[in-house]
């Protein structure tokens, strides 16, 4: 799927949640969909200034091995976020899992881009469904 089409689906889904009364949006800060989702929430703050972006990050050192360009985007999103939460101080084997569970445990809806039946995203979406969260998969819209 093209980034432009995905961004449109994501924006539409976020606006639908805003229209239902949602105002806090969490993102995990990973490269790819997490970053796109965070950037979309930040862009929507122009029209919906009451919404808040909460970055839930796995560890302080998450971006250490990223490219200069990816780090710059990450730092920009982090600086613009309304709140930043770290679920672990240092990188550990389970810190991504801990971050994902924190996002689900503190949410009532989950917007995802899920195309595989296995992996971290699939596990997190399964966990969200087990917690009865509203799950919106923009890969299927």
List each language-model region with its residue ranges.
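Acidic/glycine-enriched connector segments
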Residues: 1-141
């Amino acid at each position: 799927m093209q980034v432009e089409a995905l961004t449109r689906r994501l924006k539409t889904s976020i606006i639908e949640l805003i229209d239902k009364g949602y105002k806090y949006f969490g993102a995990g800060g990973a490269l790819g969909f997490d970053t796109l989702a965070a950037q979309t929430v930040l862009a929507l703050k122009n029209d919906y200034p009451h919404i808040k972006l909460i970055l839930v990050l796995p560890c302080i050192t998450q971006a250490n091995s990223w490219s200069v360009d990816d780090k710059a985007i990450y730092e920009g999103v982090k600086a613009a976020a309304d709140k930043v939460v770290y679920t672990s101080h240092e990188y550990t084997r389970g810190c991504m899992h801990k971050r994902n569970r924190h996002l689900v445990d503190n949410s009532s809806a989950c917007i995802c881009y899920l195309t595989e039946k296995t992996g971290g995203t699939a596990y997190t979406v399964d966990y969200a469904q087990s917690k009865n969260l509203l799950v919106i998969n923009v890969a299927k819209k």
